[in-house]
């Protein structure tokens, strides 16, 4: 099999890159081994929330110069701030065309409310997710937080208690309630099946939609704003929007314990657009080895195609980090298993020295989380110190940053993905 571009990994980075390449007329295939990190995400996307020093970021553009001084190995520092902002804005346009219902701007981060009642700075959030801006706009300062009877992946009382700890919400009235939803009685019999995805699947046929509407209105009481667990609408936000329109209330949804419906929706919509554009998905397959001709990758082999190689002009590594086996930790070293590429990390990290992989403080950022492949300003990778000109890396497989601690995982994914699409599109 021969393609213009082979993309290894079907998460946020791989699909974003694939969509951009298909729009340029390239023939792409995505080798997808299973669920991606986006299926477990909050649905909000971070561009840069915190500098390595711990300083909070409000204006990303102004903070990128300081980031380069503190972390010259960070992918943003390597690409340059103008490229980072340009590709972030390009993704905003892509998200709008996909109808992902995302709100936010590269101009300034906003604060979203987390399921535990915390406030987290972020770049883009679904418009159904509550933010500080949403709450401060409420005239009556009354919010009903509604859970679902028997559903333990969302805790209304804990959320309310923690929100009251924030000074801006100290005078707000948070009321607690629970929805019964008789349709879910079958799931309640087995707690392991009582998850957000199962709930959404049972409710999506709208067999008792009006009963659900009335139950929400009754449980909300006098409150005009309602927080719900993200359990309503599996493929997209249409079910939730219909629910909001029918109740006449300002409904908001918060992500639950994984799997996260908000992330799953985004994943499905990205994948649908890629396939609509003619892209090919090889699901349940995994790249296992590659063959080189000279200094370039010629072909790869997968678990399902060990005798029939897949060749292409360009290859994009979007396999993610340890979570999805894009990186593997052996006793002696951290390695990238398909191409055996050069590995880097943040300061003081050495991929061949286990003692540099962890921090003595459990809650501190762990150095191994910054491990990943080495890239240049075009996102081309290195092997044995030399650039592989037709092999690129995107997303969390890249080294040199702490995606969780610095709040930049999603941003690195889409910025590098669109950078690679630009590089490949401009070279052929």
From Swiss-Prot:
HAMAP family: Glycerol3P_GlpB (MF_00753)
This protein's name: Anaerobic glycerol-3-phosphate dehydrogenase subunit B
EC number(s) on file: 1.1.5.3
The entry's keywords: Flavoprotein, FMN, Oxidoreductase
Family: Belongs to the anaerobic G-3-P dehydrogenase subunit B family.
Record's catalysed reaction(s): a quinone + sn-glycerol 3-phosphate = dihydroxyacetone phosphate + a quinol
GO cellular component terms given for this protein: glycerol-3-phosphate dehydrogenase (FAD) complex
GO biological process terms on file: glycerol catabolic process
Residue stretches in coiled coil: none
Keyword Flavoprotein listed: yes
Pfam families in UniProt: FAD_binding_2
GO MF annotation, one: glycerol-3-phosphate dehydrogenase (quinone) activity
Cofactor(s) listed: FMN
Quaternary structure annotation from Swiss-Prot or TrEMBL: Composed of a catalytic GlpA/B dimer and of membrane bound GlpC.
Superkingdom field: Bacteria
Physiological role: Conversion of glycerol 3-phosphate to dihydroxyacetone. Uses fumarate or nitrate as electron acceptor.
Oxidoreductase recorded as keyword: yes
Pathway in which the depicted protein is active: Polyol metabolism; glycerol degradation via glycerol kinase pathway; glycerone phosphate from sn-glycerol 3-phosphate (anaerobic route): step 1/1
């Amino acid at each position: 099999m021969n393609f213009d571009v082979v993309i290894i990994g079907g998460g946020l980075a791989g699909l974003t890159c694939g969509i951009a390449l298909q729009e340029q007329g390239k023939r792409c295939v995505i080798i997808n081994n299973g669920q991606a990190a986006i299926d477990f995400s909050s649905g909000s996307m971070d561009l840069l929330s915190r500098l390595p020093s711990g300083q909070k970021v409000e204006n990303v553009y102004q903070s990128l110069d300081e980031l380069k001084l503190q972390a010259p190995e960070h992918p943003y520092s390597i690409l340059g701030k103008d490229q980072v902002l340009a590709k972030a804005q390009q993704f905003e346009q892509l998200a709008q065309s996909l109808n992902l219902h995302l709100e936010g701007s590269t101009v300034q981060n906003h604060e979203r409310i987390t399921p535990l009642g915390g406030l987290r700075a972020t770049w883009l959030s679904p418009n159904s997710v509550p933010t500080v801006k949403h709450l401060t706009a409420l005239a009556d300062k009354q919010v009903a937080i509604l859970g679902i009877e028997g559903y333990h992946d969302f805790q209304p009382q804990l959320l309310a208690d923690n929100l009251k700890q924030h000074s801006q919400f100290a005078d707000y009235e948070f009321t607690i309630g629970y929805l019964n939803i008789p349709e879910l009685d079958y799931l309640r019999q087995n707690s392991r099946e009582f998850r957000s995805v199962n709930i959404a699947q049972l409710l999506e046929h709208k067999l008792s939609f009006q009963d659900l509407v009335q139950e929400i209105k009754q449980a909300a009481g006098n409150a005009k704003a309602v927080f719900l667990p993200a359990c309503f609408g599996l493929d997209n936000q249409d079910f939730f929007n219909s629910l909001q329109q029918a109740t006449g209330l300002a409904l908001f949804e918060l992500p639950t314990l994984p799997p996260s419906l908000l992330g799953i929706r985004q994943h499905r919509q990205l994948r649908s657009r890629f396939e609509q554009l003619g892209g090919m998905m090889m699901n349940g397959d995994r790249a296992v080895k590659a063959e080189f001709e000279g200094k370039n990758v010629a072909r790869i082999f997968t678990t399902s195609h060990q005798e029939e190689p897949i060749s292409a002009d360009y290859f994009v590594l979007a396999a993610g980090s340890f979570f999805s086996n894009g990186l593997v930790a052996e006793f002696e070293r951290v390695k990238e298993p398909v191409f055996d590429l050069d590995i880097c990390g943040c300061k003081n990290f050495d991929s061949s020295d286990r003692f540099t992989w962890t921090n003595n403080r459990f809650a501190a950022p762990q150095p191994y989380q910054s491990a990943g492949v080495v890239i240049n300003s075009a996102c081309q990778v290195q092997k044995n110190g030399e650039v592989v000109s037709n092999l690129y890396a995107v997303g969390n497989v890249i080294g040199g940053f702490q995606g969780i601690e610095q709040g930049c995982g999603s941003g690195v994914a889409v910025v590098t993905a669109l950078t690679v699409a630009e590089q490949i599109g401009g070279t052929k």
